[in-house]
């Protein structure tokens, strides 16, 4: 943008060479502030200005908008600045910003390293969106937290008359009328409407069939469908408080442990079970049947259906205890995505779709992005990319069905340590090819040295990186070459 940036201990200024004038929009940010001492300024690969300060961390300026983001040290966050006094800043050709601190050495930052933000709110078992800025977080041992993403605060959302929190929270649903429905383990079902709370407990007759509520969905008539462990499948009419109950005793329900629910269309409800695979109910007839696929077709990787999810193409994604499957409702076929998604034998916890129609799958200790394309023959092609704690994810298991795509496209995933939040379209990848350097050559496990004779011949007359080629005779047939790169962007994931 043709600006000259000047700074001293007392401030920072920018001279616009185009208008031949000093920029006035920086006044009040750093200049003329006696409490701010500036030690370093650098511009990153995205054009942002980084300002290193004394005892006050780093400010990052978006030049187009004037927005300033502050980066400071946090003792409880190992990914924050190590120290708040910054003596030097340097942006290298790979987009890495190097930071020299007063007493904590040198650190570096790259957007392609940590792709996922982490918030340590405890064991997050389910997620629902309250409004544009707030999320309800169901927890294993702290009830429901209302997390305001604007303020960063998460506070208990509701306690009963005795001051108790509903624990553990397993499922949540915001119905079309704005009520929050909460399913718990061994605590029944709650309906929260502002300050009014109604509870449903297991009982005889027209009542909740089980206090263990694993999944909740709403139909087009405003009825709440309930999946429970031990109680089968129920439909609650909220106005009358009456239940329809479907169990293995009074219907063709596969078993009474129902784990997950999803609508394929207004007339078809798919459900997962703990041990009997996936079934469906026809809403018009209430007929229930097991999803088998065509004879001879691929079967489910496991009959434990942890999560059932329908995408925008009409494909039904099924997370099981030992892999990932897709059911093509048009062709009535099961597809096994476990090998493609690096998920074979893995416990698949939860599934969601982003606004670009990519699928995101959480497993034990990693998250997988699956891209879907048409093969031009009526079927699909799948590809995947896996992420783990080295990308910023929590280093623990993710929870079943604890995933949510928010209205703005951001995805939240719950695990044992908290919630990871990310914008799929903001994930950055390192596109710079690193320099590869040869670090050693061995012959019969003996290091080859410059100018030294082996078998009557000198193999390398100068340093290995300056050699065009190396020739061995046919008897010198056991050798090894070692090499490395200057890549600091997740170097452990570098492929050669």
What does each model-identified segment do?
Residues 1, 43-46, 91-94, 129-132, ...:
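Residue-level detector of Asp-centered blade-edge/turn motifs that repeat once per structural unit
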